[in-house]
Amino acid sequence: MKINELDTLFHLSKSPDITKLTPKVPSKVASRENAFEDSTIERVSFAPSIKGCILGLQLSKDDFINGEVVLYVYSPYDLDEQKIVNNEVIVGKKLVFDANVTKECWYLREASVELLGSITVYDKVEQTIEYTPIRVGNPKFLKPNGKLDTYLYKYKWNQ
């Protein structure tokens, strides 16, 4: 299965010493009325880009200390392709409201990962991304054009 041009997936965490990731329902499952994320399937979420990972984290002001947060970048290895739920399935089944933006995929078993490095994410918006959510709970939250905004925060790789 071709993931991206590098065949690489990424996962971000605040923990610097992970070697394995265990499937679970994310602690920040989108519970807003205008959003939807599956709350039943235990999974490890990956994205084919760092930006997709940042968008998928749904960072809030509480995540930043002095205007920044350090996140550790992991990449999985030795994945069983049969246990990957690809982005097309997530989007097609409307499992995550913004999967069409994050391009996330899921792994349904424990995943071995290697640490690639760390990034610092700043609470400054680099780009506002307007998108059509896959599923909407309450249309009153939509803009008049039927879309939502999400924010990509600035980040840099640490030395």
What are these model-predicted stretches?
Residues 1-43, 58-59:
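ADP-ribose/NAD+-binding catalytic cleft of ART/PARP-like enzymes
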Residues 2-5, 36-44, 50-159:
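Conserved NAD+-utilizing ADP-ribose enzyme module
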